Regions:
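Alpha-helical cap/lid subdomain in secreted, periplasmic
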Residues: 1-120
């Protein structure tokens, strides 16, 4: 499950409740279903409305879910993108629209993060 960018201002507890609801709905019919929870990339840090987003706390909420329930792991894409920017990767090199959508490079970051979590 990969949700979050459009809900970046929601408090982590509301976000967590929504993700848990999806998991519970699916597991009500498929109790052995496993989940990979994917946090989103970072939005453009220069856009004022995005500067106080809840994405770090929401990623923490994904880890809480993984700790509370069996068969769930987290792909911390958000943390990877934060590290890329900290280490001087220009945000415009990460985005397809200069705001919050991934480009080809970013899609590879998503894929590599997910494959790493899966142990590939």
């Amino acid at each position: 499950l990969g949700f979050g960018m459009n809900s970046m201002q929601e408090p982590a507890e509301i976000y967590k409740t929504a993700i848990l609801s999806i998991i519970q709905t699916i597991r009500s019919e498929h109790p052995d279903c496993e989940f990979l929870l994917v946090s989103p990339m970072i939005p453009n840090p220069e856009i004022r409305g995005f500067q106080h987003n809840q994405l770090p706390a929401q990623q923490d909420a994904l880890y809480q879910i993984a700790a509370e329930l069996k068969g769930i792991c987290v792909a911390p894409v958000h943390s990877i993108f934060r590290e890329l920017v900290v280490h001087k990767k220009n945000y415009l090199e990460l985005t397809g629209n200069c705001i919050n959508h991934p480009n080809d490079f970013s899609i590879r970051v998503y894929a590599q993060t997910i494959l790493s979590v899966l142990g590939c």
